[in-house]
A protein has these predicted regions:
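Short linear motifs in exposed loops
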Residues: 19-21
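Charged interaction scaffolds used for protein-protein
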Residues: 1-11, 15, 30-45, 51, ...
Length: 110
């Protein structure tokens, strides 16, 4: 699923794709109570709730092709118990890819 709006990064036990599809954006807005623009602005500024990080990662995994059950298990094992210094940059990278596009794809086109 390597395209303009997917982010690929090691998470858990291997490299995984993260993508916020339109359906996942709607769900992210619902579970966080913020519109996607407000959530992005807040996360980029470092103003976030832990749950927003976890939901962004979980929904990014689902949008990237992981089943909802597996995404929940991965987040429970590799996001909830980990330091914010590990999970926050991943959540921001997922949202930055949604906002700006994939930096790898941009570099490939240049």
């Amino acid at each position: 699923m390597a395209d303009l709006l997917s982010h690929r990064q090691f998470f858990g036990d291997r490299e995984r794709d993260f993508a916020l599809t339109p359906e996942m954006i709607t769900e992210l807005e619902r579970v966080t109570g913020r519109g996607i623009g407000g959530l992005c602005r807040a996360m980029f500024a470092g103003d976030f709730h832990h749950a927003e990080i976890v939901h962004t990662v979980r929904l990014g995994l689902i949008g990237g092709g992981v089943s909802p059950e597996e995404a929940g298990a991965l987040v429970a094992a590799f996001a909830h118990p980990r330091p914010l210094s590990e999970t926050y940059p991943l959540a921001v990278a997922i949202l930055e890819t949604l906002w700006f596009g994939s930096s790898e794809t941009k570099r490939d086109r240049e």
